[in-house]
UniProtKB/Swiss-Prot annotation:
UniProt entry tagged with the keyword Lipoprotein: yes
Stored InterPro entries: Bifun_inhib/LTP/seed_sf, Bifunc_inhib/LTP/seed_store, LTSS
Post-translational modification: O-glycosylated on hydroxyprolines; noncontiguous hydroxylproline residues are glycosylated with arabinogalactan.
Residues bearing attached sugar chains per UniProt: 44
Disruption of the gene: reported phenotype: Reduced cuticular wax load on the stem surface and in silique walls, with altered cuticular lipid composition (especially C29 alkane) associated with diffuse cuticular layer structure. Increased susceptibility to penetration of the epidermal cell wall by the non-host mildew fungal agent Blumeria graminis f. sp. hordei (Bgh). Some early aborted seeds and infertile ovules, and increased salt permeability in seeds.
Identification of the protein by name: Non-specific lipid transfer protein GPI-anchored 2
Compartment annotation: Cell membrane
Free-text function comment from the UniProt entry: Lipid transfer protein that, together with LTPG1, binds to lipids and functions as a component of the cuticular lipid export machinery that performs extensive export of intracellular lipids (e.g. C29 alkane) from epidermal cells to the surface to build the cuticular wax layer and silique walls. Contributes to pre-invasive defense against some non-host powdery mildew pathogens by preventing the penetration of the epidermal cell wall by the fungal agents (e.g. Blumeria graminis f. sp. hordei (Bgh)).
């Protein structure tokens, strides 16, 4: 009888693990479905870190030569990822402190036109208002008309990433992997115990 109880508990835990991980992927606090793609996109912008970070390794007067092309590519392919950069949440997860004032100056310094940061609130990512630009004379290159009120948040980015709801990573492979491990272990435990 105890073997049946153990197997039942293992099966319930395995089922709940898949259900909980699926719920975590869909929780509003994790952001839009494109959020996981943003981490990879933001990693391409490491050349900008010396300019936009605070503390050791940061505070450069101008961005590295790889920064501006990376920013232009990010704006073209996944402009919503800029919201994650400006919010500082992803950087904080990596232990990086972003100077929001310099991050907001970056498009002007690079000569890249970006959507207005206030549009990030449409994704549920508040980034605050743009700050006054310093004496560098670089103003933010925002395209305030880049999204009319009639457009949905999916229209924020015209690139492929904005319409890839179906490409968002899911918990299915993780759940399948867990189930492929737990079920044979439970079966072996039942047979040998």
């Amino acid at each position: 009888m105890s073997n049946v109880v153990v197997i039942a508990v293992v099966l319930i835990v395995a089922s709940l693990t898949g259900h909980v991980s699926a719920q975590m992927d869909m929780s509003p606090s994790s952001g839009p479905s494109g959020a996981p793609d943003c981490m990879a996109n933001l990693m391409n912008m490491t050349g900008c870190l010396s300019y936009v970070t605070v503390g050791e390794g940061g505070g450069a007067a101008k961005p590295d030569k790889t920064c501006c092309p990376a920013l232009a590519g990010l704006v073209e392919s996944s402009p919503q990822c800029l919201c994650y950069l400006l919010s500082g949440d992803m950087a904080a997860q990596l232990g990086i402190k972003i100077d929001k004032a310099k991050a907001l100056k970056l498009p002007g310094v690079c000569g890249v036109i970006t959507p207005d940061p206030s549009l990030c609130s449409l994704f549920g990512i508040p980034v605050g208002a743009p700050v006054a630009m310093g004496d560098e004379g670089a103003s933010p290159a925002y395209a305030p008309g880049s999204m009319s009120g009639a457009e949905s948040p999916g229209g924020f980015g015209s690139g492929p990433s904005a319409s890839r709801g179906s490409d968002a990573p899911s918990s299915a492979p993780y759940s399948l992997f867990l189930n492929l491990i737990i079920f044979p272990l439970a079966f072996a435990f039942y047979i040998f115990c």
